[in-house]
From Swiss-Prot:
Substitution effect: V140I: In strain: Isolate variant XX
Organism field: Sulfolobus islandicus rod-shaped virus 1
Gene3D superfamilies per UniProt: 3.90.320.10
Record-linked InterPro entries: PDDEXK-like_dom_sf, PDDEXK_AddAB-type
Protein name: Uncharacterized protein 207
Domain of life: Viruses
Amino acid sequence: MVIMNYEDHIKESFKVKYPADTIFPSEVGICYRKSYLARNIEFERGINEIYLDLGEQYHERIEQYFKEKLNCQTEVEIKDEIEGIKISGRIDIVCNNDLLEIKTISYNYFQVKEYHLYQVALYYHILKKQNYQINNVYIVYLNRNTREVKQFKIDEKVLENYYQKVIEWIKKFKEYLKETDYKKVPGVNNYICKSCEFKQKCIISLF
């Protein structure tokens, strides 16, 4: 009888490498270097076990409620292509012609993050291309610890403006993918770096 050792396989299961021809909406507008490295180096995604687990639980509970009680669509799959780069993602909730993106946070300071605007602008335009009628777009922040909730309605002009920024970001990213030296790809050098999977490799000094 052959006894298998699955330890290495389990360790390997945590490693990922993103496809070079695809970008995920949650990446857009954040860090060119991180997205570049994620497609050139096999890595383990950084996981804060407690916050990730709690955030996922809240997402599942909220989505289940909206689906069962309000007859909304959840985890709406989107696919598109911009500048030859595939776009792949899932939208949290589409309800009564409204797009809702749920974000869990661990602090009481409620303010829309710019990269979330990139994300919902991209979602909004792809849904329209998929023949959805979207009247309103909301980013909803939920404090994981206190359960305080704050929603922000995003103006259509803001969505249009950020969709153009999405296109420009993807154009630049496509060019950066051609680089052979990651040091030539710009990074953000801000608070995001602290939880980045590549912070040990990245030459940018953390603020």
